[in-house]
UniProtKB/Swiss-Prot annotation:
One of its GO terms (molecular function) is arabinosyltransferase activity. This is Probable arabinosyltransferase A. It comes from Mycobacterium avium. It holds the Pfam family Arabinose_trans. One of its GO terms (biological process) is response to antibiotic. Belongs to the emb family. Residues 804-825 are annotated as: Disordered. Its EC number is 2.4.2.-. Coiled coil: none annotated.
């Protein structure tokens, strides 16, 4: 009877687990196919009038092409165009970049009317026939099936094109001067397939499915408690176990058991992570993810803002949804990076309090070894800091991997299946953070055999249906997360676009990920990142060698150690299936690296005492890792480099490369190991005396090496923040945000970038009473070789050459990328005739009517020289700290570190104008020139360089080089009237912030996207020239579906001079101002008609056009 009672007590939870599991599985499987409510958006034209005629409208579609387009123009309206023709109608303004290549254009000349979709003619009609009334209406259309046009009534004047010719729409533009009337219409159905919300039915199913899965897991937990055997597990603790055994007043005692070493390690690791949170460098994708999070509420979904034609980020979007919630509180970096830091803290506490105790329980085990605990902390931090201090998903993936491993171990240790079910949920949540989150599945795979044995062992009491149903239901729960608002059709379409646009790299080329780590002069192959990956690989393969050779390490549990090694190895294998191969994805292994570090240090402390040669080989390997790591630069992303030593070179000490020092030491220890190996045949023994000193020496090499790297990394960034203060750094911005209480008045880089809204306002005036020649005061008395038209026509700057592996770069993965990048208006050309007869197109908004130019271009027979008249300096004030000369060509200058850029001599000479009318020359100074040559740029002469008595200045130019490439041109000096970028732009003006800059300007508002239509920005904030050329201009390109798709089609740009406060040598980036090609009063923003329709989960509204 007791046995029957036990059977009955098992039957109920077993039945509940089976029924709830099957129900949860079926409900969750149905979620992707259930209907959703899709917001529809339509633009109708005409809208309003200008001077009694139909007005043009602006409506830049995020997807480029619409879902459907239908335009009808009465032929009598076409006949109203002038005799020489004009624009009948178009979907892009004619002056935009590649307008004809991308848009629909209906043009008329004196002979014909032509309808062209993307430079392909669809229909042609003779203009006299149109004017004579032979046709009634011109009809043009495009949809998922085809594109075409027809002059109704004219035989043969029609044509159809493939659907790939569907045009890009930025609005409706026309030269027609006709009133709105019957037959004149345009309809643009915007592609809003991703702006969806679950229907009531879908919400009910998701809620019921989630509840059913949770019920099944709870029922399985009840089965676990009733089915477990009498065996107990010694020294096992996990967060789940701790919570289940929580008793008030007892938890502190449990935590004290870990020992003093663990508490010291906890304090050191947590302090380092918190310090790094403030001073540490950010990741390459902080701006990317922050902008997506900020625009999501108005966009209606988590839109891929910088690429991929406005597709959704699903299935990898739940983390971005979390960031969007955080951004609604504050966009300050120190706030937005909290998830990453909390994930780091969580990872370490799991390692120190549970993973190590699982790997080596007991008094003599790994968890009780102080050096192993300290090594775990050092290796973990060394692996965490270079990768995981930003908004990328790797920090959460690292945490998810550890939690999954821990739950699997709990399931195995206690022979319980509920932790395994929870592990499945956690692993799949981790996998949907990003493609590299797939490594969390490795923990499931390595523990699957042991879990399967537990299922078989309990088959008699629990059966197979209940546990398998629960595990399958747990597996299906991820569908609720991924398809909570999207459908299977939209997610598949998003994936199709991403694979079509790229970049994607095949799985068998995963070696490129490791190659990127070796690329010099690249932050992704920096010293810190190289060390993190190399030391993890050393620990992984070192432990494999030790265990395969020796089979057992006393003090280390056999099963968990193999599953830890297997999780890492299988994780690296699964990483090959990610479509991108960025080196930053190694950050997902940070938690595993820390645990492997402890395991390796403990194992080597045991075997090192057995054989001197093995210990020496261990030290040799570590020295070689250091040598390889320090062959990279101490580089960090973008502003993370500010003030950091060796950010662009290999570390050096006393002019000697550090890498050579470590390589020499590794060679010496390698030779010593070889000598010890051959001596083994003659020595009586090779063991080291088992003393405390020798045990410490055998176990500490990895600890010492990892600590050196951690101290170097933290000291580098801290030094930059402290010694540069009050100049801009990430640390300064974070401290300011904290001090302000995350106030919106703390605006990071926008508070330190000085902008010159009107370059003409600061122009200096000549000192009265001077004489000068016909070229004006800028030419001085008798210029030789310098003339107003001495400026080259083509001032395109030298190319930027970057090496492979740069994140968010659409360049070749295996050869250098050569790209050009010039600020708007700086690449030369012809412009209006200037005040002294120059025809050069001036940059930075300089007014040619007030700005003379002198240059030596074309003077190839004698040395050119010119000394300008004296210009009056204004009284010195803190808000006007510079004298600036806009110049082009090759100019000699020195960088901050003393290296020079070759060119010809342009100097500024200070002087003193005395009351008696005389002028006394003072010192001459060379400019600060951030480049690039030969484009127009602003040479800087800090007024702090001027003698206190100086009140005038003049330009002294000398060009003795007769080479056609060695010339330069200049404009008069000015003292810019500046204001901060925050004062110029404010927090409400829409701005296009490039990926690299977006996280550094938290107060600026990224242009919004609403109902599939983009808001046109007024400004663009760019990073430094190299980053712009290698990343921004490629990743955000129109061909890839980035914002340039509509920005370059609808806007023109001009560069605003900017300077980073106090950091005059710094190329921080630039600011460009946008102007509409068709002004807003002529083509106002379109009114959009909004609606809602219900679509099924499998419904596909045709492919999004994603062709170049």
């Amino acid at each position: 009877m007791p046995h029957d009672g036990k059977q009955r007590s098992q039957r109920i939870p077993r039945s509940v687990a089976a029924v709830a599991g099957i129900a949860g599985l079926l409900l969750c499987l149905a979620v992707p196919l259930l209907p959703v409510r899709q917001t529809t958006a339509t633009v109708l034209w005409p809208q309003g009038t200008v001077d009694g005629h139909v007005s043009q409208i602006t409506a830049p579609l995020v997807s480029g092409a619409p879902r459907a387009l239908d335009i009808s123009i009465p032929c009598p309206a076409v006949a109203t165009l002038p005799a020489d023709g004009g624009l009948v109608v178009s979907t892009l303004p004619p002056g935009g970049m590649d307008a004809g290549k991308n848009g629909l254009f209906v043009r008329a000349n004196k002979d014909v009317v032509v309808v062209a979709f993307r430079d392909t003619v669809a229909a042609v009609a003779q203009r006299p026939a149109v004017a004579a009334g032979a046709c009634s209406v011109l009809h043009a259309w495009a949809d998922a099936g085809a594109a075409g046009a027809e002059f109704v009534g004219i035989p043969g004047a029609a044509g159809t094109l493939p659907a790939e010719k569907k045009p890009q729409v930025g609005g409706i533009f026309t030269d027609l001067k006709v009133p709105a009337g019957p037959g004149l219409s345009a309809r643009v159905d915007i592609d809003t397939r991703f702006i969806t919300a679950p229907t009531v039915l879908k919400q009910i199913v998701m809620v019921l499915g989630t509840l059913a899965v949770l019920t099944a897991i709870v029922a399985l937990a009840v089965l676990d408690r009733r089915s477990r055997g009498g065996g107990t597990l010694i020294n096992w603790r996990s967060p789940i176990a701790w919570l289940s055994r929580y008793r008030p007043g007892t938890h502190l005692a449990n935590w004290r058991r870990v020992g003093l070493a663990t508490w010291i390690a906890d304090a050191a690791v947590l302090a380092t992570l918190l310090l790094w949170h403030v001073v540490g460098a950010t990741s390459s994708d902080d701006g990317y993810n922050l902008t997506i999070a900020r625009v999501a509420p108005k966009a209606g979904y988590l839109v891929d803002y910088y690429r991929y034609f406005g597709t959704t980020d699903a299935p990898f979007d739940w983390y971005l949804g979390l960031l969007s919630r955080l951004a609604s509180v504050s966009t300050a970096g120190v706030w937005m990076r909290l998830p990453a830091t909390l994930a780091g803290i969580g990872c370490w506490l799991i390692i120190s309090h549970w993973v190590l105790r699982r790997l080596g329980p007991g008094r003599g085990g790994l968890a009780a070894n102080r050096v192993a605990v300290f090594t775990a902390g050092a290796v973990f931090v060394a692996a965490w800091l270079p990768f995981n201090n930003g908004l990328r998903p790797e920090p959460l993936i690292a945490l998810g991997v550890l939690v999954t491993w821990m739950l699997v171990e709990r399931a195995i240790a206690l022979q319980r299946l509920a932790p395994a079910a929870v592990a499945v949920v956690v692993a799949l949540l981790t996998a949907t953070l990003a493609p590299q989150g797939l490594i969390a599945v490795a923990a499931l795979l390595t523990g699957a055999r042991a879990v399967a044995q537990a299922i078989r062992r309990r088959r008699a009491s629990d059966g197979l249906l209940a546990p398998l149903a629960v595990l399958a239901a747990a597996l299906s729960l991820i569908l609720v997360v991924v398809f909570r608002s999207q459908t299977v059709a939209t997610v598949l379409e998003s994936a199709r676009i991403k694979y079509k646009v790229g970049p994607t790299i095949a799985w068998y080329q995963d070696w490129l990920r490791y190659y990127f780590l070796t690329v010099e002069s690249n932050p992704d192959g920096s010293m810190a990142r190289r060390f993190a990956v190399l030391v993890m690989l050393l620990c992984l393969f070192g432990m494999l060698v030790i265990l395969l050779r020796r089979g057992h390490v006393p003090g280390v549990a056999s099963g968990p150690r193999w599953r830890l090694i297997g999780t890492t190895a299988v994780g690296l294998l699964l990483l090959t299936f990610t479509p991108t191969k960025w080196a930053v994805q190694f950050g997902a292994f940070a938690g595993l690296a820390g645990a492997l570090g402890a395991l390796t240090a403990f194992a080597c402390s045991r075997i090192g005492l057995h054989n001197r040669r093995n210990l020496t080989l261990y030290v040799t390997a570590l020295l070689f890792v250091l040598a390889w790591a320090t062959s990279g630069i101490n580089g960090w992303f973008y502003v993370g480099n500010y003030g950091v030593p060796w950010y662009d070179i290999q570390p050096v000490i006393a002019s000697h490369p550090v890498t050579s020092m470590f390589l020499t030491l590794s060679i010496i220890t390698g030779l010593l190991a070889a000598w010890q190996h051959f001596r083994m045949d003659y020595a009586g023994h090779t063991e080291v005396k088992d003393s405390r000193r020798n045990r410490v020496l055998a176990s500490t090499p990895l600890l010492v090496v990892a600590t050196i790297m951690v101290v170097g990394e933290v000291a580098s960034l801290t030094k930059g923040a402290v010694f540069r203060y009050p100049l801009y750094t990430t640390g300064k911005a974070n401290l300011a945000a904290i001090a302000s209480g995350l106030s919106p008045t703390s605006c990071a880089m926008a508070d330190d970038v000085l902008a010159e809204p009107d370059a003409n306002a600061g122009m200096l005036q000549p000192l009265p009473g001077q004489t000068f020649g016909p070229d004006g005061p800028l030419g001085g008395v008798n210029p030789v070789g310098f003339k107003p038209d001495g400026v080259g026509d083509d001032l395109q700057s030298d190319p930027v050459v970057t090496k492979p592996g740069l994140v968010n770069s659409d360049a070749s993965p295996n050869k250098p990328n050569v790209a050009y990048s010039d600020s708007a208006g700086t690449a030369g050309g012809k412009g209006p005739v200037g005040v002294n007869g120059s025809h050069a197109a001036l940059p930075f908004g300089l007014d040619p009517a007030r700005t003379p130019v002198m240059g030596s271009y074309g003077e190839n027979s004698l040395a050119a020289t010119a000394t300008s008249a004296w210009y009056q300096l204004p009284p010195r004030t803190p808000d006007r700290p510079l004298v600036v000369v806009s110049a082009a060509g090759a100019i000699w200058s020195y960088k901050e570190d003393g290296t020079f850029t070759y060119g010809q001599s342009l100097k500024l000479q200070w002087g003193v104008a005395r009351p008696d009318g005389s002028t006394v020359p003072l010192a001459e100074v060379q400019p600060i020139d951030i480049g690039p040559q030969p484009a127009w740029r602003n040479l800087r002469f800090p007024l702090a360089w001027a003698p206190p008595e100086a009140n005038v200045a003049r330009i002294v130019a000398y060009d003795p080089n007769l080479s056609s490439e060695q010339w330069f041109a200049f404009t008069p000096p000015r003292v810019p009237v500046t204001e901060t970028l925050q004062q110029l732009i404010g927090s409400q003006t829409p701005v296009m912030m490039d990926i690299a800059t977006a996280a550094n300007f938290p107060c600026q508002r990224p242009f919004s996207e609403h109902l599939g239509v983009a808001e046109l920005p007024a400004y663009r904030i760019l990073p430094d020239r190299k980053q712009t050329a290698a990343s921004s201009n490629l990743w955000q390109s129109s061909e890839a579906g980035g914002p340039f798709l509509f920005l370059q089609a609808l806007l023109r740009t001009s560069t605003i001079p900017t300077y980073l406060r106090g950091d005059w040598y710094r190329d921080w980036g630039s600011v460009e101002q946008y102007f509409r090609l068709v002004p807003a009063d002529q083509a106002p923003d379109a009114a959009i008609e909004q609606g809602v329709m219900t679509v099924h989960g499998w419904s596909r509204q045709g492919p999004i056009r994603a062709l170049p």
